[in-house]
């Protein structure tokens, strides 16, 4: 308990930019249930906070790494392919919009590594909590035919969960399941190490 409290003390004593970024990132999975428009707005807002942060702190060197260069190269390839697209106008928005994901990946790396990765623990703990609640809700839906809010899938055999009339719960799992599994493995590994040290040292 004291371990988590220390992390949250750092969170609440951080700068406004950090506070907003970590708070939005912590509840990021919830935006999946609010629709694509809200989710994309969230990403753009986080991108702006991140850009302001690195400008204020003059941390431009952070962008000088393999990940940023690789994503930027991929974006340039998309722009080049746009020249040969049959429907250039329709493809233009998606291609230009890809830049928000480049900055989103970079801001995840940036904030995950601040404060000796303490922000990372806050964010991933929140994601894990949300993921568990969503999973328990799906189990409840399997057993009762509706989720805890009373939502029912219009298609028998398909689960809706908190998405109500949109059968896209699989997209949510694809986005978070690997991250959650890696985080759980890290938790169990740290717990195992702690128990070994406690018993033998």
Predicted regions and their residues:
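Hydrophobic core segments of transmembrane alpha-helices in multi-pass, intramembrane catalytic enzymes
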Residues: 39-50, 93-107, 141, 148, ...
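Sparse, context-dependent recognition of short Cys/His-centered cofactor- or disulfide-binding micro-motifs
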Residues: 15, 67, 147, 154-157
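Alpha-helical transmembrane segments of multi-pass inner-membrane proteins
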Residues: 28, 79, 121-154, 161-201
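Small-residue-rich segments of transmembrane alpha-helices in multi-pass membrane proteins
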Residues: 73-75, 101-106, 129-133
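Non-cytosolic membrane-interface motifs at loop->transmembrane helix junctions
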Residues: 90-97, 154-160
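Transmembrane signal-anchor hairpin modules in multi-pass inner-membrane enzymes, especially those
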Residues: 1-90, 110, 114, 118-121, ...
